[in-house]
């Protein structure tokens, strides 16, 4: 018989920042590791390492924020992620709610989508995962043809890791940045 326990330890932002600057962040943190953060509004969140890049680790929220936010004010996916209200909200409002030390360490990411034959590009510090990053390439051509050139993030290879909760509501659905291939009014999402 085995017993499995979670180990929690204190870490300072400057320790993480130094590891990132030295190119040793992946020696300190691995995919699946979680960091508890407090927004400047007081909301407490957990970010989780979900994948790796040449710059280090990719962190996304483990669960949903307390308040919901739509992809756009109207029911449309025109312009894809680049033109979405969600993108503007994350990179114009939420980015400034993050702890200063965390915000300074975020490396912007270039996001490219092909929507109706048009190449749409943006560079973002905060972003939602695509259908392909969440579920892999299987089904992406039908569900989310804008993002088929991407690969699945390591953490999301199991269904359990894709489930999120919303404070006070239990398991909850959440948005992906991929325009839904079958509907001009929707973006893809993960159901609970």
Protein language model annotation of sequence segments:
Residues 1-192:
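Collagenous Gly-X-Y triple-helix signature in extracellular proteins
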């Amino acid at each position: 018989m085995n017993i499995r326990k979670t180990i929690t330890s204190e870490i300072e932002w400057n320790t993480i920042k130094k590891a990132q600057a030295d190119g040793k962040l992946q020696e300190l943190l691995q995919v699946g590791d979680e960091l508890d953060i407090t927004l400047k509004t007081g909301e407490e969140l957990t970010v989780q390492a979900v994948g790796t890049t040449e710059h280090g680790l990719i962190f996304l929220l483990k669960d949903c924020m307390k308040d919901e936010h739509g992809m756009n004010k109207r029911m449309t996916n025109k312009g894809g992620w680049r033109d979405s209200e969600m993108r503007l909200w994350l990179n114009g409002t939420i980015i400034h709610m993050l702890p200063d030390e965390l915000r300074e360490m975020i490396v912007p990411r270039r996001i490219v989508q092909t929507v109706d034959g048009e190449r749409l590009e943006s560079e973002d510090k905060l972003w939602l995962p695509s259908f392909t990053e969440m579920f892999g390439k299987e089904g992406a051509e039908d569900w989310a043809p804008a993002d088929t050139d991407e690969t699945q993030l390591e953490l999301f290879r199991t269904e359990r890791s894709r489930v999120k909760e919303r404070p006070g509501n239990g398991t909850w659905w959440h948005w992906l940045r991929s325009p839904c291939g079958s509907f001009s009014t929707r973006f893809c999402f993960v159901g609970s």
